[in-house]
């Protein structure tokens, strides 16, 4: 869903940090 995609993107950014 929409939330799932949002978390996935956020997690990706957090892992990159």
UniProtKB/Swiss-Prot annotation:
Subcellular location: Secreted
Keyword tags: Gamma-carboxyglutamic acid, Ion channel impairing toxin, Ionotropic glutamate receptor inhibitor, Neurotoxin, Postsynaptic neurotoxin, Secreted, Toxin
Secreted found in the keyword field: yes
Tissue specificity: Expressed by the venom duct.
Main localisation: secreted
Gene Ontology CC annotations of this record: extracellular region; host cell postsynaptic membrane
Modified residues (4-carboxyglutamate): 3-4, 6, 9, 13
GO MF terms held by the record: ion channel regulator activity; toxin activity
Superkingdom as given in the UniProt entry: Eukaryota
Task performed by this protein: Conantokins inhibit N-methyl-D-aspartate (NMDA) receptors.
Note: The mature peptide does not contain cysteine residue.
Name listed for the protein in its UniProt record: Conantokin-Ca2
């Amino acid at each position: 869903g929409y939330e799932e995609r949002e978390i996935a993107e956020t997690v990706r950014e957090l892992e990159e940090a």
